[in-house]
Each structure stands twice: as C-alpha cells, then as structure tokens.
C-alpha cells in the first residue's frame, strides 16, 4: 500500500525546471528576503565569534565569563523565536517584525561601537537586545517566503536563498 502511495505522490510532483529560477528571481520580494537573510546572518554570526574578546577587552569582563555572556544569545533564541513566530501567525505584520528586528541589530552594533560605553551591565543588556532581534527577524523572514513564492516553487526559492546566503 505504501509503495502505491509513494508512486502516486511522485507522479504529482513537478520536475525541476531552470525556468523556475528565472521566475523566482523576478519577484522583488524574493530579493528583499534574500538580501535581509545575508545581511542579518552576517551581522550576527561573525559578532558571536568575536564577542568574547569584546566582552573581555572593552567591558572588562573576566576571561571566564566573557564567553558565557555571548553564548546566552543562542539559548535565548530557542525560547523567543517560537513566541515571535506565534505572534506573527496571529497578528501578521511580518515586514514590521523584520524591520524592528533589523533596526535593533543595527542599534546594538552601533552602541557596542561607542568607546565610552564600557559598563558590563550595558554589555549584558545589549546582548539580550541582540538576542531578541535575533529571534524577531527569522521568525518572520522564513514564513514570509511562502507568501510571495508560488507553492510549486518553494523548494527552489529556499535553495536559492541559501545559495545567495552562502555567497554573501
């Protein structure tokens, strides 16, 4: 019975066509999401790599604790991303959620760059804020793709976004 179901579902699938790629890249919203994805992840992941040095050298946090504070960021996203995803499901406003998260990331990076800000408590608040932003953006970014891309091209669209992200 299962073999018959698999055969039936395989017959319903459309084959990949290069024309799908050209149709997807003509959608303006696709480029907004792809560029946001590149900029977002390139603002967060490199920061996490160098954040322990920043905590130690700028904020005077002990070497032992300087790695713990930035490490809290991914754990916070585990808790917050489903919450913000649910908010997006109930209220919509995906563009607003992505914009708020993006502006928060920019603000946090700018505040980290201010030489006069050296208080360890400020560093903790900024990391928490970055964690909130790190949850906001993907909770609305990834579910926005099916809203702008036809269902039969979703796999190709997600693959293109990851491909563009790897180039970025």
Residue ranges and their predicted role:
Residues 2-34:
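Juxtamembrane intracellular "pre-TM" segments in multi-pass secondary transporters
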Residues 151-168:
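A late C-terminal transmembrane helix in Major Facilitator Superfamily
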Residues 27-78, 138, 142:
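Extracytoplasmic gate region of multi-pass secondary transporters
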Residues 52, 56, 88, 145-150:
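Helix-terminus/helix-capping segments at the ends of transmembrane helices and short amphipathic helices
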Residues 80-93:
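Helix-to-loop junctions at the C-terminal end of transmembrane segments
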Residues 94-144:
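C-terminal transmembrane helical hairpin of 12-TM major facilitator-type secondary transporters
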């Amino acid at each position: 019975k299962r073999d018959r179901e698999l055969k039936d579902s395989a017959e319903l699938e459309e084959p990949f066509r290069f024309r799908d790629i050209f149709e997807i890249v003509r959608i303006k919203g696709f480029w907004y999401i792809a560029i946001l994805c590149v900029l977002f992840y390139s603002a967060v992941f490199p920061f996490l790599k160098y954040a322990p040095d920043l905590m130690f050298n700028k904020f005077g946090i002990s070497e032992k604790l300087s790695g713990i504070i930035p490490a809290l960021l991914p754990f916070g996203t585990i808790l917050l991303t489903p919450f913000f995803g649910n908010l997006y499901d109930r209220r919509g406003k995906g563009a607003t959620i992505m914009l708020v998260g993006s502006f928060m990331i920019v603000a946090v990076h700018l505040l980290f760059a201010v030489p006069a800000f050296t208080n360890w408590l400020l560093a903790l608040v900024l990391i928490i804020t970055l964690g909130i932003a790190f949850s906001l953006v993907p909770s609305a970014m990834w579910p926005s793709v099916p809203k702008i891309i036809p269902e039969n091209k979703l796999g190709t669209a997600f693959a293109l976004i990851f491909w563009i992200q790897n180039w970025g």
